[in-house]
Amino acid sequence: MGPGPRCAPGDPGWMLGALALMVAASGRFAFAFNLDTRFLVVKEAVNPGSLFGYSVALHRQTERQQRYLLLAGAPRDLSVADGYTNRTGAVYLCPLTALKDDCERMDISEKSDPDHHIIEDMWLGVTVASQGPAGRVLVCAHRYTQVLWSGMEDQRRMVGKCYVRGNDLQLDPGDDWQTYHNEMCNSNTDYLQTGMCQLGTSGGFTQNTVYFGAPGAYNWKGNSYMIQRKDWDLSEYSYKGSEDQGNLYIGYTVQVGSAVLHPTYITVVAGAPRHQHMGAVFLLSQESGGDLKRKQVLEGTQVGAYFGSAIALADLNNDGWQDLLVGAPYYFERKEEVGGAVYVFMNQAGTSFPDQPSLLLHGPSRSAFGISIASIGDINQDGFQDIAVGAPFEGLGKVYIYHSSSGGLLRQPQQIVHGDKLGLPGLSTFGYSLSGKMDVDDNSYPDLLVGSLSDHIVLLRARPVINILQRTLVARPAVLDPSLCTPTSCVQVELCFAYNQSAGNPSYRRNITLAYTLEADRDRRPPRLRFARSQSAVFHGFLSMPETHCQTLELLLMDNVRDKLRPIVIAMNYSLPLRMPDRLKLGMRSLDAYPVLNQAQALENHTEVHFQKECGPDNKCDSNLQMRAAFVSEQLQPLSRLQYSRDTKKLFLSINVTNTPSRERAGEDAHEALLTLEVPPALLLSSVRPSGTCQANETILCELGNPFKRNQRMELLIAFEVIGVTLHTRDLKAQLQLSTSSHQDNLQPMTLILQVDYTLQASLSLMTHRLQSFFGGTVMGEAGMKTVEDVGSPLKYEFQVSPVGDGLAALGTLVLGLEWPYEVTNGKWLLYPTEIIIHSNESWPCQPPGNLVNPLNLILSDPGDKPHSPQRRRRQLDPGGDQGSPPVTLAAAKKAKSETVLTCASGRARCVWLECPIPDTSNVTNVTVKARVWNSTFIEDYRDFDRVRVDGWATLFLRTSIPTINMENKTTWFSVDIDSELVEELPAEIELWLVLVAVSAGLLLLGLIIILLWKCGFFKRARTRALYEAKRQKAEMKSQPSETERLTDDY
């Protein structure tokens, strides 16, 4: 039967206009199953635009002739020419032929009588239903109108009308079913009663009942009617609900069946798509007195979804109770791109249905998914009822086929029939109406008739379904010893097939050919086996049946197989290749030659081949890999902390791996034993002992053995270059993971954490450790001093700090501290600091806390020497410790007669602590400390000493709150020798004549001495012969000259 009208009662164009706005756009895909789409029976309208296919039904005629017919309603078809009417609608009966235009109009004679009834545009064929094999046919026209006269004024009542015809689609006056008027609505009432009831909007048959929907009754509240016949008795039933509101459309669709709310009694299921604007389904039961009583109402969940516009009953899980499917074609979810829904309510053993659906099926956006629903029988003959759902506005229309199981309806469709892939010109809105549950080609599989709004109907026939039996796959031997392989075979595989038809037809013995594919070691690359015939790991073959057929294949072992623990999986999958026509073929060609494989069966099989291993009788290796690891020094001593400095180059990791038995584990061979190490970027793999064991990529992978045998031990020593440790590095983490293809489930990763102590390397140097200065003159008090020159002679120390390397930033600060001899024990000034300047990229003064530098705020100026008289001069001293030798003074040229030393350690001087932070820079930093000798103190307290030495200390240290960063303090001493001021007398000038006399006397004396030496022969030289003779005589006397003589022999 058809799903009922898709227009609002009383307005034939409302729904058509609304549906015209809906355009489908979906690309869903499902595996094609057993509804054939190549050999079709297609029928087209005689009169285009008649909505031929608006409603459809499959019918089996058994009277007068045996045949199957396709019934199609065309509610907008032209009327039979009578001179009074133009368009009444019609119902067509179509034979199962290859022709598209051989449908005949069903003879329903209704003469036009405008004074009593109006048949113009009565939508004959809005509902078409068949009672089943050898049953009758129901045809309705829900816009059939009665005319009432009140004086000269006529009143029209659109009560609707239904016609029952015999099995041969002819009127039999002797059949009470056909002659009964079926007028359930009273045309003498107005729309508030049943005067506009629109009977026949929906309707159908059971074996002893005919039922109708009348959604326009009672101000379009709606009603459902049922006529039941038992023997010669006839009973009429209608629903008289307590609802007082209109526009519910109860009866828009109606289904009747038993085993719904009672095992044997009938239950009427009526849709009301406008109930509370969200739709509802009423479940009504028979009561005495002809009433239908409401038992349960299932309500929709979304406004405007038209929940209840299509309904179907089917026992989905084979529990003996019919379940309920409800369509809501205008349901939508914008974000999810959903358009249309089908609610599935599972029967609770006849007591009721749950308020919430057990399953909610969705269609794509704007598809009107669920506008038609049909129970189509068991099309694949798996023992469970199947369902078809139309989505006419998805593309050119689609029909979704859902299978069911013991758990109910399956969520995913098993097949989607695409209207645009059928190759039918002019086809659209495919799936607008559906009818099934009848096998029209006698192949034991029910078929499906699909209607549309485009004047086409299409018969989809079910292909036979093949169950593959005895799909065995056996490998011999099951445990492979590679030493027993021959050049032609290592493993032998045997596969066998047999089949039957799912419908259980024993006469179906077609010769079919299965295509199969065998793949050795499917999950591994490269594979470990190959087929001898194909020289690869994949083999394609064919097997012909109907009898059980087997085939045997030989396989060979690949060279250099490493993995001998995991079994070799030999997988098989198979299919049924058929040469289907490339184009559409119309007609009733037998589909027995085009079976399909049962998609519910697994279309693959597999077997395993194990390697012979020393792993006990179960051939299962239970290893017991254990590991100990630690960071060690070059002397292989464990490290608890890494004392890192810039001189640190290497770090070592010691790893010990064993595979020994324990109480819990057998300690059998560990195949493909691997060690994976993940180390931080600061560590770079340098070397491994034993060499060649490990390889470094993103991680370090060490091959321990294949297999790593029982009771085997192994020690690895891995050396890393330390390249990336910074001041921010707190620790070094290494993660070690043992793995094996043998069975061992307790291999947990090990994490080693080595704390890092970062030792900074900085240096402190002093340009001149020991300065020289002086004191003398007169005593001057603090009040009389204006400039630093008034204090005394100047001093300047130049400290140099080398770069640390990595910048400290916020981690800490380098500080130069000075233990400065500030005053003597009696509180008098000693060395007065005037200025501290730091030189790096820029220069700036250092101001230690406590106002210790130039506390008297004396005026700073460059020191200079004052002129002295020609007879007396002060010793010139270098106050800044310039490069080169200090000038020689009288005090420095001779040892001081008396000297004293002032230090803070001895208690003879008091020191203060001066601190200057060193900038965080990579350049060398110079710190200049300027001071003045407090002249007055030395004149008053140390005039009795020729020299006073004052000592102090400078320390470079790190100040940080990070415990892992440290630096060894750098300390140096500085000193100054302060001499008392001395005056040296210059010698008196000598007369010139005395000089001339002295020179002349000297020359005369020299001349006398030369004459005397000449007279004595001092200037005469010896002869050469005498020299040689004497030398030769000497050589003769001493046969072996001494070493000294040898060295001096030529002189």
Curated annotation (Swiss-Prot):
First and last residue of the signal peptide: 1-32
- Cystines in this chain: C94-C103, C140-C162, C185-C197, C485-C490, C496-C550, C615-C621, C694-C702, C846-C904, C911-C916
Can you tell me which residues bind Ca(2+) 3?
Answer: D439, D441, N443, Y445, D447
- State the Gene Ontology BP annotations: cell adhesion mediated by integrin; cell-cell adhesion; cell-matrix adhesion; integrin-mediated signaling pathway; leukocyte migration; positive regulation of protein localization to plasma membrane
Coarse class of the primary localization is: membrane
From what superkingdom does this record's organism come? Eukaryota
**What is the name of the protein in this document?**
Integrin alpha-3
